[in-house]
């Protein structure tokens, strides 16, 4: 079996549309952050959903960095590439970030009620992941010899605990519940599909001998989410890419054929375009193209693909706007 790792990325170009320019009169959304123990020269605010919402500040210990912006929809702001903060239109949110080695502690969460509730929930989810020592990098799991059986069991436990946290949370919007669920599912289901194959490649233990049951049935019952909030999660969309190749590999096996993973950009585009439809196809292809452009190699190859995508599959005008911006 061939190993394929879809790298998680939260660069701005990995965005799915939930953000449009705000209409006149709509309240601005405000984020303020104070950092302690941060060693970088600059503090960066980068929106996961759009490259058009971002800001940077010179880093000074304890200084309040304030950014007000327009958005009509829910977004996730990434601070210094590590800390995710959830914001909706008109929210005001303040947090303190304390850097201790590789860990970032979020404290003093204050602001509008919805923003406080949403970000308390997000931090509770992060705490669960930390306490479980649930790693985001699958290659690191293989290096530590975490068995696929353990990873899959831990993934199921994580999803259950996150669902329980969401049920218990008060004053949270459907959007934050959906986003957190989709992001968690992205990590969990990617582990189901990818980790047994990666572990077999790294540790030379065939999938059939990993005591995980029938690999071909690990994703039974899965139905891709089609809502905009779920498709705005890079983690979830990465998983959807892997799901396409997983299903096509299983189909090839059932037909007695050998599946060849599409390693080339153009081949991946073609396979994903055939597998999905509607909003899911639009989001997946958009992310694939953004990822390729951000890679910075042979970017001119994207021209023909972008034209094909716009002509045949693009429904979301914002995606086209971002691609045009990236190609300038």
Where are these regions (language model features)?
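Bacterial Sec-dependent N-terminal signal peptides
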Residues: 1-30
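Oxidative protein folding and maturation machinery
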Residues: 106-328
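A non-transmembrane, solvent-exposed segment enriched in polar/low-complexity residues
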Residues: 25-172
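Generic detector of bulky aromatic hydrophobic side chains
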Residues: 10, 34, 45-50, 215-218, ...
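Short linear functional motifs in flexible/disordered or boundary regions
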Residues: 21-22, 45, 196
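Generic signature of intrinsically disordered, low-complexity segments enriched in small/polar residues
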Residues: 15-17, 41, 47-48, 55, ...
């Amino acid at each position: 079996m061939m190993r394929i790792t879809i790298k998680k990325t939260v660069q701005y170009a990995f965005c799915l549309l939930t953000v449009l320019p705000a209409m006149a009169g709509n309240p601005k959304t405000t984020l303020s952050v104070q950092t302690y123990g941060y060693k970088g020269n600059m503090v960066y605010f980068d929106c996961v959903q759009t490259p058009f919402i971002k800001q940077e500040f010179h880093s000074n210990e304890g200084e309040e960095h304030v950014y007000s912006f327009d958005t009509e929809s829910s977004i996730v702001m990434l601070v210094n590439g590590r800390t995710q903060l959830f914001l909706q239109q008109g929210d005001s949110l303040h947090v303190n970030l304390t850097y201790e080695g590789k860990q970032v502690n979020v404290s003093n969460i204050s602001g509008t009620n919805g923003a406080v509730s949403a970000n308390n929930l997000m931090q509770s989810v992060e705490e669960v992941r930390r306490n479980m020592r649930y790693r985001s990098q699958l290659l690191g799991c293989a290096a530590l010899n975490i068995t696929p059986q353990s990873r899959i069991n831990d993934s199921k436990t994580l999803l259950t605990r996150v669902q329980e946290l969401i049920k218990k949370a008060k004053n949270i919007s459907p959007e934050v519940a959906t986003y957190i669920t989709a992001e968690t599912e992205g990590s969990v289901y990617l582990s189901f599909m990818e980790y047994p194959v990666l572990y077999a490649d790294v540790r030379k233990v065939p999938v059939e001998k990993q005591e995980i049951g029938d690999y071909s049935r690990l994703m039974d019952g899965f139905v891709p989410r089609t809502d905009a909030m779920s498709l705005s999660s890079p983690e979830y969309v990465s998983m959807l890419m892997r799901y396409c190749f997983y299903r096509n590999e299983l189909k090839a096996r059932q037909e007695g054929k050998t599946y060849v993973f599409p390693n080339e950009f153009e081949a991946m585009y073609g396979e994903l375009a055939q597998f999905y439809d509607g909003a899911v196809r639009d989001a997946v292809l958009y992310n694939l193209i953004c990822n390729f452009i951000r890679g910075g190699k042979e970017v001119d190859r994207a021209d023909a693909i972008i034209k094909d995508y716009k002509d045949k599959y693009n429904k979301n005008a914002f995606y086209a706007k971002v691609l045009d911006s990236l190609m300038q």
